[in-house]
Amino acid sequence: MKLLSKVMILALAASMLQACNGPGGMNKQGTGTLLGGAGGALLGSQFGHGKGQLVGVGVGALLGAVLGGQIGASMDEQDRKLLELTSQRALESAPSGSNIEWRNPDNGNHGYVTPNKTYRNSTGQYCREYTQTVVIGGKQQTTYGNACRQPDGQWQVAN
């Protein structure tokens, strides 16, 4: 399970970094595929034990990657900016368990960020667990992660 947590964190980090990338960065479909695969692997890991659990991870990752790629292909730059701004606001000041919503009025895509448990990591940084849910073209995708507050006040996915 620790390996899966690391994979999930890396996938979320790649996604958040994508929001800052210029034209040479990963495209939105690639980001969706990465996030979907990681989310599917996490979900698949909840089933079975031993080799059965590995099969669950593999199947979940594959199905999640396909669905995530389709959703990512439909998520535009404005969607990603709205998600990033909402994530920062939710992690900084929203009470645990509250949904902080975003909506792109141009295409109807929307979602919400739900901050959860707040804790201090081994270096003393404030960190939060969170859930991000997006609905793109009527299809919902949910990811889970941890982020820590940086000295400049920005929240960054924990690695």
UniProtKB/Swiss-Prot annotation:
It is a lipid-anchor. InterPro entries: Anti_2 (IPR032635), Gly_zipper_2TM_dom (IPR008816), Surface_antigen_Rickettsia (IPR016364). Residues 1-19 form the signal peptide. GO terms for cellular component: cell outer membrane. It is found in: Cell outer membrane. Its main location: membrane. A lipid is attached at C20 (S-diacylglycerol cysteine). A lipid is attached at C20 (N-palmitoyl cysteine). Keywords: Cell outer membrane, Lipoprotein, Membrane, Palmitate, Signal. Pfam families: 17kDa_Anti_2, Rick_17kDa_Anti. Belongs to the rickettsiale 17 kDa surface antigen family. This is 17 kDa surface antigen.
